[in-house]
């Protein structure tokens, strides 16, 4: 990102992290956000009713973030599922989140439910039943949860186009995405 923080990139004046957190809040579920130490990302969430937790070992990778989130979720709501919504996928909105939640409930609440793109590639969000929380608390390194999901039957929910998998990592990708969405820079 050439020194820029992709989670603070704006869409119609709103930082991506705040926008995705607001989408999660629109689901009506409690929202917990795991972030590295205080800074601009925390500031972007000011005024939102979320539980923030600090990922002290964020340099370790995605495993540390998911582990921290799972520990917090297990402590606050041990009998509730955990939805993982990666904030750097800007195409996901409240409707998509509700779609995943509704499918999880329809499946009986004990199956992993995960968004995919039109090609079937796994994306975000995904929701995991409480019985998997302990597996997530043991994640390490840059494991995005693959080891915790190993052997699980995953119900896939297609989210139109590539909204569930579009991860923008460069200023050029951001510019192209904004242009395709009709959103000014």
Residue ranges with predicted function:
Residues 119-120, 131-132, 162:
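Short acidic/polar capping segments at secondary-structure boundaries
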Residues 89, 124-127, 137, 165-166:
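A residue-level structural signature of the nucleotidyltransferase/glycosyltransferase Rossmann-like core
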Residues 9-12, 133-137:
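Short, flexible loop segments at the rims of nucleotide/cofactor-binding pockets, characterized by
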Residues 123-134, 171:
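Conserved nucleotide-sugar donor-binding
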Residues 1-122, 153-159, 184:
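Nucleotide and nucleotide-moiety/phosphate-recognizing core
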Residues 134, 138-185:
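Conserved alpha/beta core of the MobA/IspD/sugar-nucleotide pyrophosphorylase nucleotidyltransferase superfamily
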